[in-house]
């Protein structure tokens, strides 16, 4: 990684970039660009307008930030080595981990979609606890951010799940940043602000949005609003993907399903969000109810994983393998 500036100085923050004095630094921070990562993925035009700096200055700063973060063309072999070293978070079920190729991946957005009661929120609660486990136990020794759009977060479940895996409940809850999003604009603003939070607390290794589509559906109903809704949703999803890639963390989004009256065979339900949500997440997992506490998980789309399905269980202690 080339984290040296052109004058040989090691680059750790925006203030280390050549030509970024206190005046420009203040403008960048006030405009919401408080980290190297935020600047590196910005467009020169957006940065120039937002921070009130010349376009040529914005282009130079972005170039320096990208060099510091080693954002460049890579060979397929380098990509292979990165993929092999991808970190994963255990779900609590060996069967479900196996379906996912070892667990929930970092640097990737995973979508969990299914009907009410299919286990989406339970799995999100479990992952926000499991990410805190040490590496040797299937965690990342990290913290979680939980963005709740439907008011379904329950501290009681966090307490029960953390006790079950040997974590002190209050400490586990202290490692989960929680925010209730009241509308779609608030939801997007929270994700915008996450760059600053993650820069201050690099221990954050998991971001959850449960659910990603509910506010967008409620605020933009009908076909006449579809284009605006999809445009906003697409921007929001790409915000989350950038976070996953920039900070090497896992992103989980949940999504609802709706009935398709034109389906006469197979599964008559389809995930909400249309083509926007079909293409952005790296891994798409459908969850379904089964008998009792059992749930079915099925890989719907993942470029590196075979299609398949497994049964797991939701118990008082959390997500576990289903008993035969």
Swiss-Prot record:
GO terms for biological process: DNA recombination; DNA repair. GO terms for molecular function: ATP binding; ATP hydrolysis activity; ATP-dependent DNA damage sensor activity; damaged DNA binding. Coiled coil: none annotated. PROSITE patterns: RECA_2, RECA_3. It holds the Pfam family HHH_5. Involved in DNA repair and in homologous recombination. Binds and assemble on single-stranded DNA to form a nucleoprotein filament. Hydrolyzes ATP in a ssDNA-dependent manner and promotes DNA strand exchange between homologous DNA molecules. This is DNA repair and recombination protein RadA. It comes from Sulfurisphaera tokodaii (strain DSM 16993 / JCM 10545 / NBRC 100140 / 7).
């Amino acid at each position: 990684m080339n984290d040296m500036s052109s004058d040989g100085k090691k680059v750790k923050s925006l203030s280390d970039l050549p030509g970024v004095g206190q005046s420009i630094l203040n403008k960048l921070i006030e405009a919401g660009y408080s980290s190297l990562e935020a600047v590196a993925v910005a467009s020169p035009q957006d940065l120039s307008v937002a921070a009130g700096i010349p376009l040529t200055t914005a282009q130079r700063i972005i170039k320096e930030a990208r060099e510091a973060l080693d954002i460049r063309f890579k060979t397929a072999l380098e990509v292979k080595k990165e993929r092999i070293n991808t970190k994963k978070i255990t779900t609590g079920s060996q069967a479900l981990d196996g379906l996912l190729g070892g667990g929930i991946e970092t640097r990737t957005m995973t979508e969990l979609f299914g009907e009410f009661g299919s286990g989406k929120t339970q799995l999100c609660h479990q992952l926000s606890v499991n990410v805190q486990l040490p590496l040797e136990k299937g965690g990342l020794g990290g913290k979680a951010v939980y963005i709740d759009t439907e008011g379904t977060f329950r501290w009681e479940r966090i307490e029960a799940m953390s006790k079950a895996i040997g974590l002190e409940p209050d400490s586990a809850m202290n490692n989960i940043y929680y925010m209730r999003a009241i509308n779609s604009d608030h939801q997007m603003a929270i994700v915008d602000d996450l760059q600053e939070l993650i820069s201050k607390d690099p221990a954050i290794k998991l971001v959850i949005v449960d659910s990603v589509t509910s506010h967008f559906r409620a605020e933009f109903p009908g076909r006449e609003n579809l284009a605006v809704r999809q445009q906003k949703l697409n921007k929001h999803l790409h915000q989350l993907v950038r976070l996953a890639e920039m900070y090497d963390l896992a992103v989980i989004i949940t999504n609802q399903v709706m009935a398709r009256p034109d389906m006469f065979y197979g599964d008559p339900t389809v995930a909400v969000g249309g083509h926007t949500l079909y293409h952005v997440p790296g891994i798409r997992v459908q969850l379904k109810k089964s008998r009792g506490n059992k749930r079915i998980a099925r890989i719907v789309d993942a470029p590196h994983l075979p299609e398949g399905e497994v049964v797991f269980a939701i118990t008082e202690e959390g997500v576990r393998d289903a008993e035969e």
